[in-house]
Amino acid sequence: MAVPPRPLQLLGILFIISLNSVRLIQAGAYYGIKPLPPQIPPQIPPQIPQYQPLGQQVPHMPLGKDGLSMGKEMPHMQYGKEYPHLPQYMKEIPPVPRMGKEVVPKKGKGEVPLASLRGEQGPRGEPGPRGPPGPPGLPGHGMPGIKGKPGPQGYPGIGKPGMPGMPGKPGAMGMPGAKGEIGPKGEIGPMGIPGPQGPPGPHGLPGIGKPGGPGLPGQPGAKGERGPKGPPGPPGLQGPKGEKGFGMPGLPGLKGPPGMHGPPGPVGLPGVGKPGVTGFPGPQGPLGKPGPPGEPGPQGLIGVPGVQGPPGMPGVGKPGQDGIPGQPGFPGGKGEQGLPGLPGPPGLPGVGKPGFPGPKGDRGIGGVPGVLGPRGEKGPIGAPGMGGPPGEPGLPGIPGPMGPPGAIGFPGPKGEGGVVGPQGPPGPKGEPGLQGFPGKPGFLGEVGPPGMRGLPGPIGPKGEGGHKGLPGLPGVPGLLGPKGEPGIPGDQGLQGPPGIPGIVGPSGPIGPPGIPGPKGEPGLPGPPGFPGVGKPGVAGLHGPPGKPGALGPQGQPGLPGPPGPPGPPGPPAVMPTPSPQGEYLPDMGLGIDGVKPPHAYAGKKGKHGGPAYEMPAFTAELTVPFPPVGAPVKFDKLLYNGRQNYNPQTGIFTCEVPGVYYFAYHVHCKGGNVWVALFKNNEPMMYTYDEYKKGFLDQASGSAVLLLRPGDQVFLQMPSEQAAGLYAGQYVHSSFSGYLLYPM
C-alpha cells in the first residue's frame, strides 16, 4: 500500500528539527552559549537565594532582567557528555527560536521549501508543570545585615571577694596646685649666725704723731729648709764592749686545736646483772613541732547555697589594693542565646553533579501532524513558580568530644575531732620476759646520776698526731744587748724613691697686727618685738654680714688625697763602684742581730759579668676575674719582679732583704661587693671594702708601710664569700705592688 508523499515529507522535517535541538543541548547550551571564565564571579542580585544543598527544594530562578540572562553569561556545566538536567528533557520539544539566518532544510527527495509557509502567531500556552530543581546557583554576595539590638542585661555574678592585691605603683606627680593666698606676717626671726669677716678697708690717711716706742718682739719665723748634708765626720774611737745581755723566755704559745679522734678501743666484756625493775613512766614531753603540711585532701562536695541576706546600706570607702588573683571558679551555667552574628563571608562555589533524569512519560496519542506554519514571535516569559516547601530537619549530629576537666575545687572544711575514749584501767604487772632483740636507739633521755666508777679499760692504741697549732704569741722583747762597735761610714747611697706625702702640718703662727680698720659695723639687733598686724611688706635689702664667730675646735684630719702626678725625672744616677764583697746595696746597715753580715746580700750578675743592683720591687696584674675566697689572690701577670721575690704562681711576696716596704693594691668591683685584706704572715694588717652598685664598675685601693724580716710573707686575700666581687678584664686591671723603701 502506497503512503502519500506529503506525510513522509512532514515526518522528515520533524526528524531534522529534533536532531538539531538534541545537538544544541548536547553541546552544553542553547543558541551557541559560551562558558564564562571561572575567576570572575557574576554579580547576583540580593533577591536570588543562596546556594542550597542537594536534596532540598530550590526556588525557581527567574530569567530575563531579574535573573540570569539567556545569553553568554550562563555558566558551563563541565561534566563531560552528561546531559544537563533540563525541564524539556524527554518531553515535548518546544519551538526553538532561530537567531540569525533561518534554518534552510537540505534539499532532497520529496522536500518542499518552507519559506512561503508562515502561519499566524499561536495562542499563548498554559504554564507547564513545575520542573525538577535546577543546578545549584553561584554563591551570592550579600550585604552585611543591620547590627542587632543589644540583649538584655545578664544576672549579676556570684563570687567570693578576691584577696587584697599588691600595692600599686606610685602615681605620677600631679599638677601644681593653685597659688595660695598671702599668709599673715611672721614673727621676727632669731638673730642670724654672724657672717664672715669682711675684707680690710682702704688705707687711711697718714696720721701726724710722735714716733712710738719700740714694738713687741715678733713671732718666731717659719722653719727654714733643710740644709745640705755635711761631709761625713771622722770615725769615732772604738767603745768598750758592753756586758752580755740576757733575754727573758717568751710566753707559752696558744693551745693547739684538738687532735684527731683515735680509733675505738676493743669491746669490753658483757656485764653480768639482772634486769632492773621497769621504771615509772617519765613526765609528759613538751609539745612537738608542727609536722609538715599534709597532702591536700579530696575535693569536697559543693555546699548548699546560703540564704541571700537583706541588702546592706551602700558603703563608702576607699578602693582597696588589687587582690591576689583567686583560684578559678566553677564553670558557670549555659548562658542565654546571644545575638545573631553577622553574616559570614560568601562560601566557596558549590560542586555538584546534575540530578538523575526523571522517568520517561507515557507516550501520548499521536495526532495528525498539522501544516508547519511560519516562525512565530517569541512569547512572553512565564511567571516564576512558587518555592517548594522546606525540607525536614536533619538527624542530630554526633556528640562532640568531652570538654577539658574543670578547675580544682576549694578544699572542704576540716572535720571535727572525735571524742577521746576513756582511759583504761592499769593492767597487772607482768613477769620479766626473755631478752629481746636489741631495739633501735631511743631518744636521748635526761642525764642520770653519775654511776659507779668502772674498771679501767685496756690501753688503746696511740692516736695520730694532731694538726699543727697556731703560732704562739710573740715573746717579751729581750733586754737591750751590748752596744756594738761603730762601723766604718759607707759610701753615699743612691737616691731613694719619693716617700708617701706627709700629713698636712698645723696652721702657722698668728701674723702681726694689721692696720686699724674702718668704722665698725652697727651693733647687734635688739630682742624681737611683739608680732605686728598688717600685710607683709616688700623684701628688704640684704643686711651686712655679721661678725666672725669664735674659732671652733680643730676638725678631724681629712682623708688622704689621691696620689699626685708623677714628678719630673731626677738627675742621672751615679752608680757607685761595687765593693769587692759584691754587696748589691750600699750601706745595708746592721743585721737583725746587730752585726753587719760579712757579704750582705749579693746581687745577680748583669749582662757584662758585673753585679746587677736590683731592688726588691714588683708589680703584678690579675688576669682571671673572681678568684677563690680564703686563699691568696694570684696576680699572675708580671710587669716587674726585682730579685724574683714575688711568686705569681702563689700570689705571695717573700721578704729576702729586711727593711721597710711599701705595698699598694688597686682592685675593681663588679657583680657584688668586694672585701680584701692585706696579710702579713697569715695575719691581716688592713682591710678594704667597696659596695657594689648595679650597672656600675667601682674601684677600691689600699696601701700600707710594713717592716719585714727575712722570710716574712705578704699577700692579698678575700676573707668572705659574701663579698667576693673582685673583677679583672682585658682593659680593666686589678694590681698588687710593693717595693723596698730602705733596708735595715
Curated annotation (Swiss-Prot):
UniProt region (Triple-helical region (COL1)), positions on chain: 119-572
PANTHER family: COLLAGEN ALPHA-1(XXIII) CHAIN-LIKE ISOFORM X2 (PTHR37456:SF6), SI:CH211-266K2.1 (PTHR37456)
Annotated Gly residues bias: 204-218, 329-338, 412-421
Protein induction: Up-regulated in astrocytes during the repair process and in mesangial cells in diabetic animals.
Biased segments, Pro residues type: 129-138, 559-579
Any one GO BP annotation for this protein: endodermal cell differentiation
Description of post-translational modifications: Prolines at the third position of the tripeptide repeating unit (G-X-Y) are hydroxylated in some or all of the chains. Proteolytically cleaved by neutrophil elastase, in vitro. Proteolytic processing produces the C-terminal NC1 domain fragment, vastatin.
Compositional bias segments (type: Basic and acidic residues): 101-110
Region (Nonhelical region (NC1)): 573-744
Limits of the C1q domain: 611-744
UniProt keyword Secreted present: yes
Physiological role: Macromolecular component of the subendothelium. Major component of the Descemet's membrane (basement membrane) of corneal endothelial cells. Also a component of the endothelia of blood vessels. Necessary for migration and proliferation of vascular smooth muscle cells and thus, has a potential role in the maintenance of vessel wall integrity and structure, in particular in atherogenesis. Vastatin, the C-terminal fragment comprising the NC1 domain, inhibits aortic endothelial cell proliferation and causes cell apoptosis.
Protein name in UniProt: Collagen alpha-1(VIII) chain
Region (Disordered): 101-395, 412-439, 457-590
Localization annotation: Secreted, Extracellular space, Extracellular matrix, Basement membrane
Organism ancestry: Eukaryota, Metazoa, Chordata, Craniata, Vertebrata
Position of the signal peptide: 1-24
